[in-house]
A protein has these predicted regions:
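Flexible glycine/proline-enriched surface loops and loop-helix/loop-strand junctions
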Residues: 18-23, 52-55
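A glycosyltransferase accessory/donor-loop signature
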Residues: 34, 39-183
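Short, P/G- and charge-enriched loop/turn segments at secondary-structure junctions
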Residues: 21-27, 102-107
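A recurrent flexible, glycine/aromatic-enriched loop bordering the glycosyltransferase active site
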Residues: 24-36
Length: 183
């Protein structure tokens, strides 16, 4: 398996402790994001990995479900691919916990500048909001080129919409500010 490091988890001491407790992740072991995976399907099938991973996920209460099961199963046995292939919110928002760690900051800024895949993990889905530059404009640009361009999409809870998008926009503005300083 090959994947990108999950910088949101790698940068958080609290979550790293949680992963140590839940899946036995040692403090020096990298943790990957399962949003974009490269797999040797022949080896995957021959090793019957799916059954083992499903069993792990079924028998445990992992906070990140299949991602934790995959990380436990492939601990120390996966390859890292460049972060640009799975850019998650902690990266495109340049969270402080990433900015304060020079090695992670460098990876995040490089991925943000050369993004190939945006992975809208977490609570902010691009289709729940009108077009906002830097957040979901590329999503809408590519959606307009597909057969799904006129499909009705799920909408965010309107009671939280304004507060939440304001928070997200503030994060994006801060990320733009940090990009100017660190790039």
């Amino acid at each position: 398996v090959a994947a990108t490091c999950d910088l949101g988890i790698m940068a958080s001491g609290r979550i790293r402790k949680q992963k140590h407790k839940q899946i036995g992740l040692s403090f020096d072991a990298p943790y990957f994001n399962a949003g974009v995976l490269m797999m040797d399907l022949k080896k995957w099938r021959e090793g019957n990995y799916a059954a083992d991973i499903i069993k792990l996920a079924s028998e445990n209460q992992f906070s990140n479900h299949d991602q934790d099961a995959l990380n436990k199963f492939f601990m120390y046995n996966w390859q890292e691919i460049p972060l640009k292939w799975d850019v998650i919110p902690p990266v495109f928002n340049l969270f402080t916990k990433i900015l304060t760690k020079p090695d992670l900051r460098k990876k995040a800024i490089e991925a943000k500048l050369k993004s190939a895949i945006f992975h809208y993990a977490g609570g902010y889905k691009p289709w729940e909001y009108e077009i906002y530059h830097g957040f979901n404009d590329k999503y809408y640009e590519y959606l307009s080129k597909t057969e799904f361009r006129d499909a009705k999409m799920p909408q965010f809870d309107k009671r939280r919409k304004n507060r939440s998008i304001k928070r997200q926009l503030l994060r994006l503005r801060l990320a733009d500010f940090w990009m100017q300083i660190f790039k």
